[in-house]
């Protein structure tokens, strides 16, 4: 059996004294949509930076297409990135280029194609996301949902083997969100790619993911199909899946006794300013 496109083993990573990951294991099967979920601040986007070599792990191993990301030189890492398409959280469109030229940008940077071939390629990708008619518009003329779709067309223009989505549903209205969900599913099926979707939108992911991982406090606390996670008896998993305001992830930030805190402040206010 061949190795999965993405394999993460015993991943450790910290920012200063703050641990972000402490022994994370993840497998992303070929041709499937894998969801990576977790509360805000759990390091989901950081995980993508580590996966694509934008940051280096403190310990552990990250394999992309069977190669250890941490052991690659710049040239080899660059070659692997060309096999990967990424939809950034903010879309990251170039504001001074038309929709057409935004999608064409990676092709112009990495390949030398006749203009007729390039045009056919770009228009085909825009057609796939429903925006061929918007090819000559500027990014400032697009809605948030349209901009996200243009960015997706750009992500697939080089026919990647792996598609990575970083919070693809953030800031979208229900219709635009439904469009993105549909596109993720359809592109995965028609292009035969492997997809990683990083998000905390449980309902949307449940409709498209083959397998889900839930991160919390630096570890994978649950892994399985969306249905298996929904049936989990683990308190932290149940809280996240149901959206409960309090639980293992507490409502209150850690603090001392309220009465003592108020009383202490009141006593300080009574002291002459020179004695504070």
Residue ranges and their predicted role:
Residues 159:
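Conserved catalytic motifs of ABC-family nucleotide-binding domains
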Residues 52:
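Helix-to-loop junction immediately C-terminal to a conserved catalytic motif
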Residues 67-68, 115-133:
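Conserved ABC ATPase "signature" region
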Residues 138-142, 146:
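Conserved ABC ATPase signature
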Residues 163-166:
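Catalytic Walker B motif of ABC-type/P-loop ATPase nucleotide-binding domains
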Residues 37-39:
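The feature captures the beta-strand-to-loop junction immediately N-terminal to the Walker
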């Amino acid at each position: 059996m061949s190795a999965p496109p993405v394999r993460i083993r015993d991943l450790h990573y910290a920012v200063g004294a703050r641990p972000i990951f402490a022994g994370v294991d993840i497998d992303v099967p070929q041709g499937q949509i894998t969801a990576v979920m977790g509360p805000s601040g759990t390091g989901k986007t950081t995980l993508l930076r580590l996966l694509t070599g934008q940051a280096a792990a403190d310990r552990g191993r990250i394999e992309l297409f069977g190669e250890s990301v941490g052991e690659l030189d710049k040239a080899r890492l660059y070659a692997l990135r060309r096999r990967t398409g990424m939809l950034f959280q903010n879309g990251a469109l170039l504001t001074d280029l038309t929709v057409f030229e935004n999608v064409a940008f990676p092709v112009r940077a990495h390949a030398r194609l006749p203009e007729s071939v390039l045009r056919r390629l770009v228009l085909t990708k825009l057609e796939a996301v429903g925006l061929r008619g918007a090819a000559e518009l500027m990014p400032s003329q697009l809605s948030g949902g349209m901009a996200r779709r243009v960015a997706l067309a750009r992500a697939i223009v080089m026919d990647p083997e792996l598609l990575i989505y970083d919070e693809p549903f953030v800031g979208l209205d229900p219709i635009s969100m439904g469009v993105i969900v549909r596109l993720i599913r359809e592109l995965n099926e028609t292009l035969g790619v492997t997809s990683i979707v990083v998000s905390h939108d449980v309902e949307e992911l449940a409709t498209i993911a083959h397998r889900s991982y839930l991160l919390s406090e630096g570890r994978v606390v649950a892994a399985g199909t969306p249905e298996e996670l929904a049936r989990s008896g683990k308190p932290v998993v149940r809280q996240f899946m149901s959206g409960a305001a309090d639980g293992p992830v507490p409502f209150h930030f850690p603090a001392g006794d309220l009465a003592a805190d108020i009383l202490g402040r009141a006593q300080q206010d009574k002291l002459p300013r020179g004695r504070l």
